[in-house]
Regions:
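FAD-binding core/adjacent interface of flavoenzyme oxidoreductases
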Residues: 1-9, 67-156
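Glycine-rich Rossmann-fold phosphate-binding loop(s) that bind the pyrophosphate
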Residues: 10-14, 161-163
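Gly/Ala-rich phosphate-binding loop of Rossmann-like dinucleotide-binding domains
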Residues: 19, 23-24, 170
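Glycine-rich FAD pyrophosphate-binding loop
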Residues: 24-44
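Glycine-rich flavin
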Residues: 37-39, 43-45, 49-59
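Short beta-strand to alpha-helix junction loop
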Residues: 52-71, 160
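Conserved small/polar residues in nucleotide/adenosyl-binding loops
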Residues: 173-174
């Protein structure tokens, strides 16, 4: 069993900020567990400006904002395990996880930060009718396809909703 002072579950904005702050506060035995193949979480698909003004004093895109935290971590001893799925967190602060590189592990921590972020609700959870709505994407899925994978989601696009993410998608769709 591996023992660490702090396990941070999630390598998105919350997890990265928590790791930087813990390091700045003097904690040295820190491990980030991230299920994706890269750090940054949702920020990686947010190519619009609007991040970093308070923390870094300038407007950054999501990937730029994540990159700043990742660069800050390179100057520390914070350890990172990518492509790692957390299976269970026990009341005794034991984190059960699995990855291709490390296999099944139990990591005992003095403290745990839950920084898993959020996921969009599924098609069923938001009440999209039908059994297979071809060409219907959530905003997050569309952002990922367009901004990260380089795919077009359609020649003609209809955006349903006028919240922040709908307006952001509209501005991205026009590029």
């Amino acid at each position: 069993m591996k023992n660490v002072d702090l396990v941070i579950i999630g390598g998105g904005p919350a997890g990265l900020a928590a790791a930087c702050k813990a390091w700045e506060s003097g904690l040295r035995d820190i491990l980030i567990l991230e299920r994706d193949k890269e750090l940054g979480g949702i920020l990686n698909q947010c190519i619009h400006n609007g991040f970093g003004l308070h923390r870094f004093g300038e407007q950054l895109t999501g990937p730029e904002y994540a990159g700043r935290f990742i660069e800050m971590l390179k100057d520390t001893g914070v350890k990172v395990q990518l492509d790692t799925m957390v299976l269970e967190v026990t009341p005794e602060k034991k984190v059960h996880c699995v990855s291709k590189e490390y296999g099944y592990q139990i990591i005992e921590a003095k403290s745990i930060v839950l920084g898993m972020g959020c996921r969009e609700r599924t098609r069923g959870a938001i009440g999209t009718p039908g059994t297979r709505p071809a060409g219907v994407y959530t905003a997050g899925a569309a952002q990922r396809y367009v901004n990260m994978e380089g795919y077009l989601v359609g020649k003609r696009v209809l955006i349903l909703g006028s919240g922040d993410i709908g307006l952001i998608m509209r501005s991205e769709e026009r590029r």
